[in-house]
Amino acid sequence: MAKLTVKDVELKGKKVLVRVDFNVPIKDGVITNDNRITAALPTIKYILEQGGRAVLFSHLGRVKEEADKAGKSLAPVAKALSEKLGQDVVFPGTTRGAELEAAINELKDGEILLVENTRFEDIDGKKESKNDPELGKYWASLGDGIFVNDAFGTAHRAHASNVGISANVDKAVAGFLLENEIAYIQEAVEAPERPFVAILGGSKVSDKIGVIENLLSKADKVIIGGGMAYTFLKAQGYEIGTSLVEDDKLDLAKELLEKAAGKLILPLDHKVANAFAGYTEVKETADQNIPAGFMGLDVASKTIADYNTQLEGAKTVVWNGPVGVFENTDFQAGTVGLMEAIVKQPGVKSIIGGGDSAAAAINLGYADKFSWISTGGGASMELLEGKVLPGLAALTEK
């Protein structure tokens, strides 16, 4: 990576500003999934071990007005982080002001402080989300000229807490998580070991047009599953029953199929039901057609067998988006079959691009079998599309 990293700067005795992604699910004050906190630990521990004084910034959820602040404080995160690190995490509970400044100035080497939810600054004019120059300058002034961005999940956004701070410090560098995310995803797309197979699921073609086009030029095969497969199948003249479809994208789907020249792999059969919720009948189709009154909610046995064929010998696999409604046990066999087909390939570099695919791998017990699971759905999508991430572009060149 052509950007400075946390290992390139002297940290001892410095107040080091760190953007992390602690946007974790919290229910009744309890964190229900702490993966993002765990993912940030290597960078945080390194800064503390080097004698840095870590000042952490993160958002949590969306905050547009005062009422939205309920349940959005980072207080439970400070507590969880303290337990994981085995040391106190100072939490003044504010995003600016004399109390915060005093607490930061009192930090000693190897100590850590967490600033309150950066999106609390969005209540009065979206200062965080719109990268208010004064806010970025103020937050930058709280440190000693070093900013570490380790929040890949927000790297595709230009906010005051990443791009804004970067513009007002001497050195803006990447943390270990950000460095790894870029290394795995960018390298997989730009310099893959071949055969390179990309798998795209999810519901809408419109969400992934740029990704499909970029990957068609880079991958040896692009497997399409999930809801967006039905738009491609309808474009080819197949019956899709009451399945999800984007009729306004049929011409685009035809164009992509022509451009793909056989690289796009679609389902061969489906697991269907007579309703999305409250269904009374579930069955497998004999082929690519779906009968009237039924909707496709997963791929079926022929497609799962085809996944094994298509993935045989693959050396690089990038997967973004489930191929069925995996949250429902009736419709998770396709996603499980796909994961099985990926992880059994010898020597494969297997990468999951965050979001629902990551949730599927974690919930279904496959997480530790993949080479890398991204922490950022939107950011990984933009990398797969070949876009420049603002949070990364703002870092200091080597």
Swiss-Prot record:
Q: Where in the cell is it found?
A: Cytoplasm
Pathway named in the protein's UniProt entry = Carbohydrate degradation; glycolysis; pyruvate from D-glyceraldehyde 3-phosphate: step 2/5
Annotated Gene Ontology cellular components are: cell surface; cytosol
Query: Which Pfam families has this protein been placed in?
Result: PGK
Which Cys residues form disulphide pairs?
Answer: none
Claim: Cytoplasm is one of the keywords in the record: yes
Which EC class heads this enzyme's classification?
transferase
Supply the alphabetized keyword list.
ATP-binding, Cytoplasm, Glycolysis, Kinase, Nucleotide-binding, Transferase
Provide the residue positions that the database annotates as binding substrate.
Answer: 21-23, 36, 59-62, 119, 157
Q: Which Gene3D superfamilies match?
A: Phosphoglycerate kinase, N-terminal domain
Which EC number(s) are documented for this chain? 2.7.2.3
Reactions listed under catalytic activity: (2R)-3-phosphoglycerate + ATP = (2R)-3-phospho-glyceroyl phosphate + ADP
Q: Name one GO biological process term.
A: glycolytic process
Q: Report a single Gene Ontology molecular function.
A: phosphoglycerate kinase activity
Where does the chain bind ATP?
Answer: 208, 296, 327, 354-357
Quaternary structure (record): Monomer.
Spell out the HAMAP family in the cross-references: Phosphoglyc_kinase
Family note? Belongs to the phosphoglycerate kinase family.
Q: What is this protein called?
A: Phosphoglycerate kinase
Q: Which organism is it from?
A: Lactococcus lactis subsp. lactis (strain IL1403) (Streptococcus lactis)
